[in-house]
């Protein structure tokens, strides 16, 4: 059956609650400084799995039971966000939808780019994710061949990418009866709060003036322009589209070789590919000036002492990388290396007595950088490393054959975002780059031979 004629039939929709009640002394979870820094947003992803020959079909009842046990260990995720500062761990649970799809998995995976709004049918409802304080929502879609698609939304309230992957790896380890975790262990939500204590909640009026000190020098007749800039309110009329490109292992090796310099004699795979994507994107710009990227960096190993790798929270900070748009590839690499190398210092500042001032100072630097490049040339490169665990979410069917970090709509939160995922090809490790960019920029890349020499369209 063609994907255009497929039907996703909802079999059941329910709320999965923890298998055991959360102890009374853990019923109120106060978010850390790092959690407080970020406004909750809804993050989508869908993972596609083939059913290997000889492997039993998904046992939906066991999935529900293991998810219930997992929520006991990750108890704040079954609660409700009361504010930007507190989660009430009331065991209300998370939405769980079971659905059947009347076509083959392979036909959908081969035709992802033509699904359009049908991709949304694989996802659970978004209702209550922000306004209702729900942390996660899950939908399991079983195809006629026995393969399945596992789709979720999360709100980033108290989980970064590593925490989200750990949540799902815990669940799948229980389901597949692997021994990574003991069933009733409580996961570590305390390390991040101890390392990065929260700051007192602010009233909304106190948050508004953050950018007023960043106004440019006053010039006669430019009050309106100044107001526009200082309010961080840029207007973009262009249509944002999503595309995926593969950068295979051979191309990665060539980019590393091209990135070598005295300043960075041994660039990493990630540095070389990120610099290549950044340089390629800004090459579409017809104006000179500055550009910037934000790169989420895991702070767990950068804290003194380091935090456990399975500690839960938004334990990351964005490395702010700035450059002139006309820089060479090795110069982009050097900027990336330099900014990431400073993240240990940020971790130290956020742990000190002046952590609130440090948080505000970093935010002001970000706003200033965005203003300097007029917002248009500000990007996010978000790495989904294999080490973060997303490609290791294994229900006993093996690792996913495809990961798609979007539903049917490219929203404003994804604008100018590049999600960089590792994959294994016949020659080694490569990258898949999901790019959410202005349509004009995508068209430029799709017709640029210098870009296509290293990247091949995949969606």
From Swiss-Prot:
One of its GO terms (biological process) is saponin biosynthetic process. Gene3D superfamilies: Chloramphenicol acetyltransferase-like domain. Keywords: Acyltransferase, Transferase. Soapwort saponins possess anticancer properties and are also being explored as enhancers for endosomal escape in targeted tumor therapies. They may also serve as precursors for vaccine adjuvants. It is an enzyme of class 2 (transferase). The keyword Transport does not apply. Component of the oleanane-type triterpene saponins (e.g. saponarioside A and saponarioside B) biosynthetic pathway, leading to the production of natural products with detergent properties used as traditional sources of soap. An acyltransferase that catalyzes the transfer of an acyl moiety to QA-triF(Q)RXX to produce saponarioside B. Monomer. This is BAHD acyltransferase 1. The gene is BAHD1.
